[in-house]
Amino acid sequence: MARACSLGLLLLLLLLLRTVVTVSLPVIVVRLNKAALDYVSDIGKAPLQRALQVTISDFMDPSGEVLQSTRVQILDAHVPFFYLKFIAGFGVHLSAAANFTIKVFSVPEPMELVLPVDLLADVHVARDSIGTLVLSVPACSSIFSPAGMLDGSISTSQELLDRVQEHIKADLNNKLCLHVYGLVQDLNVHLGTLIGLSPVGPESQIRYSITSMPTITSNYISLDIGAILSLLGKPILLPMHGAHPFVLPWPLGDAGAMATVGLSQHLFDCALLMLQKAGSLNLEITGQLNSKNNPLNTSVLGQLIPEVAHLFPEPTPLVLKVQLGATPVVTLHTSNSTLQLQPLVEVFAAPSNLALQFLFSLDVMVNLDLQLSVSKAKLRGSTSLLGGFQLSVATSNVGSVDMDQVLTLISTVFQKPLLDHLNALLGMGVVLPRVHNLHYVHSEVLVREGYVVVSSGLAYQH
């Protein structure tokens, strides 16, 4: 599998994507550009060299009175040149130059020679029935150049050298391409990791799959990728807004980036719906009587609401239960993304050794600035407050509530816990489409009208 690692990025090429929308699936558009192929070419030399360490059959030397079996061994396979390019509508063309250092254990003395070989292969990229990518090699050839003798082997006759070369070429001609086929099959296994489940939270997962045949041009390869978000094994389904598929313009983002990933509004909507249904956005804030920084107690609240002071003459902690009954709304505008929450905040008194006593509840609206970033293979978020809280009384067991006075108290005790909770949750991130051990690096996130674009480099880590 080690030899599959680097060329596994070649798959990623396959794994990135323009998406044709299906009704219940969020869509992501990813493109791998020429820079990604250059990276694969660079890190792919080592695994290709290992794959070319093949065994050569013994050479039967007819020069004597009796045929002699002479061992032939590849000492080293060096790949100084490895190049990949896109073939529009097909896949990727591979060309590589390899220099084989070969030792022939002939009598009376062994000889060492260097045999240059050019490898050419066309790799076809397709989608299989389970929604992952599959590679095949319909065309492969080996082109041999004349071998050169290393110093110390100059006494070998030209006739013997010619016979040895013919034997080596005949033996390697099919073996080299067979090992290229094997390398590609290893990559297919690696590509299968694209469709595995990735956790989003303790009870939620995301699963990616390729939804259509890849689109390949001379500049990039793109795939249509669908995402299924699930909670407790059940998919989160949200109707698509409009019938038009998500299309990522070309060109877009950093022209020198290896990968360009487009994330649709629908993906964000489904992710937030899942978090809301899971209860992950809910929180509880408890006051501490001995804390100077937490005025969440009946003594402070009683100064604003007389009935609270009447019911609780002794200082009693307060508890805020925050529940999001409505799905959060993310809005994506050029260079700006916001998150709107509309939680219900229930205020309870928490007398010692007694059940919580409901006081009143508030409908809250809060607008947050949403900052997005990519770390390794995850899209992460952080929030900050935009303006203030908008509060209104939903129900009350303590009579009239003067919101002008309560607003300052609730905002003070509510803001930091809310932001801390959201930032911890969004900071966990959602895994972007990738194969195992492949990470996005040096990523730049741009917000456009109705979608997000990630321009990124790629790094394969063992």
UniProtKB/Swiss-Prot annotation:
Keyword Ribonucleoprotein tagged: no
Keyword set, alphabetical order: Disulfide bond, Glycoprotein, Phosphoprotein, Secreted, Signal
GO CC aspect terms: extracellular region
Residues carrying a glycan: N99, N297, N336
Signal peptide: 1-22
Phosphoserine: residues bearing it: S63
PTM sites of type Phosphothreonine: T55
Subcellular location field: Secreted
Matching InterPro entries: Bactericidal_perm-incr_a/b_dom (IPR017943), BPI_fold-BPI/LBP (IPR051660), Lipid-bd_serum_glycop_C (IPR001124), Lipid-bd_serum_glycop_N (IPR017942)
Domain of life according to the entry: Eukaryota
Family: Belongs to the BPI/LBP/Plunc superfamily. BPI/LBP family.
Protein name, as recorded: BPI fold-containing family B member 2
Annotated organism of origin: Mus musculus (Mouse)
Native organism taxonomy: Eukaryota, Metazoa, Chordata, Craniata, Vertebrata
Gene designation: Bpifb2
